[in-house]
């Protein structure tokens, strides 16, 4: 349970978490146009583009795992500084070494630094009492950043794109004090009077003490208490199955955004029209965010999510017979809508 005086509840922590999350996810947001840049400006083949994109996004995942391992053991501000230095250095190195082999390695390292950076940002947002609202802010802002990237990046050289990514990390150093240095200790969840009231020799367990303290805080802060769930009835394999399903889902999403613009070029669709569609489709994510919130409030999470994943697969399947303007338009709009729907 989070103390009302928690540093994570300050607006500065919210602002830092949102900015860092947006910067950390910037490559993912712009991957369709970045993939095209690797192909057209660096003359990478389509398989090479896929491997470079996979290295970048794979590094993002690896970095997030590293952040999860060290976030409770190290000062978070130190992790932010290290990740900023790594991201800036590797993006600048990409402007100097542009062979396929060098780019493959450097994009993995850049993705890893970005993953640590983003992991700290997400942990900062997730530690708030109303973390759902914080992530809704993130999804809302992400739509505008995604649109901006898809509009401006195609107008830049490859080196300029790398430099923009490098520079975007630097403001985090100026707002470093806004990032809480440590997480919330579990001991802080117990109200000072709770243990004394129960008595030192009381038969209540520590879990019961935390439950009572949590109820007291909920009543004081106006937070609706959530009934305790008996996790012993959930098989240990279920969380791992859920994580595996999430990983596979995002591998497919990453692959889609990596190749969709390249596929449109192979289908001889007008490049300017495709670019405009990719820009405006970003704003469709806002509708996805709103609809997902309304549906989840009414019908819960599991059934809408399962149905959405099935529709997601069917939407991509409409491109199997071939790609024309109508199919491309319908596919990218529905895909982006459902992608954000799944996130929410």
Descriptions of predicted regions:
Residues 63-76, 288-301:
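Helix-to-loop junctions at the C-terminal end of transmembrane segments
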Residues 51-60, 275-285, 335:
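Transmembrane alpha-helical segments of major facilitator superfamily
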Residues 137-184:
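Helix-loop-helix hairpin linking two adjacent transmembrane segments in secondary transporters
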Residues 106-140:
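Cytoplasmic helix-loop-helix junction between adjacent transmembrane helices
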Residues 31-32, 237-279:
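Extracytoplasmic gate region of multi-pass secondary transporters
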Residues 101-110, 326-335:
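Paired small-residue
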Residues 78-92, 303-318:
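Structural signature of the two symmetry-related core transmembrane helices
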Residues 43, 96-101, 300, 321-323:
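Helix-breaking motifs and short loop linkers at transmembrane-helix boundaries and internal kinks
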């Amino acid at each position: 349970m989070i103390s009302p005086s928690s540093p994570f509840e300050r607006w500065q922590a919210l602002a830092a978490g949102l900015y860092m999350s947006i910067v950390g996810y910037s490559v993912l947001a712009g991957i369709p146009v970045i993939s095209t840049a690797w192909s057209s400006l660096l003359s990478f083949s389509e398989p090479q583009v896929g491997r470079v994109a996979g290295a970048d996004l794979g590094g993002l995942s690896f970095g997030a795992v590293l952040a999860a391992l060290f976030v409770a053991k190290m000062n978070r501000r130190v992790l932010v500084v290290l990740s900023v230095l790594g991201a800036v250095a590797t993006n600048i190195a990409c402007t100097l070494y542009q062979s396929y082999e060098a780019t493959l390695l450097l994009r993995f390292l850049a993705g890893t630094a970005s993953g640590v950076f983003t992991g700290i940002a997400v942990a900062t947002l997730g530690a708030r009492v109303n973390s759902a609202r914080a992530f809704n802010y993130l999804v809302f802002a992400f739509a505008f950043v995604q649109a901006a990237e898809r509009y401006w990046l195609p107008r830049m050289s490859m080196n300029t794109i790398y430099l923009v990514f490098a520079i975007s990390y630097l403001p985090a150093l100026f707002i470093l004090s806004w990032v809480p240095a440590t997480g919330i200790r579990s001991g802080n969840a117990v109200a000072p009077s709770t243990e004394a009231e129960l008595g030192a020799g009381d038969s209540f367990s520590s879990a019961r003490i935390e439950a009572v303290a949590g109820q007291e805080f909920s009543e004081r802060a106006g937070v609706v208490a959530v009934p305790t769930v008996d996790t012993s009835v959930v098989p240990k394999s279920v969380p791992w199955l859920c994580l595996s399903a999430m990983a596979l889902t995002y591998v497919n999403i990453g692959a889609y955004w990596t190749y969709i613009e390249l596929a449109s070029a192979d289908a001889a669709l007008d490049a300017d029209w495709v670019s405009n569609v990719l820009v405006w489709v970003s704003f469709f994510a806002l509708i996805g965010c709103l609809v997902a919130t309304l549906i989840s409030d009414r019908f819960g999470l599991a059934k809408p999510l399962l149905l959405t994943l099935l529709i997601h697969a069917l939407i991509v399947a409409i491109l199997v017979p071939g790609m024309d303007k109508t199919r491309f338009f319908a596919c990218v709009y529905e895909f982006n809508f459902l992608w954000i729907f799944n996130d929410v």
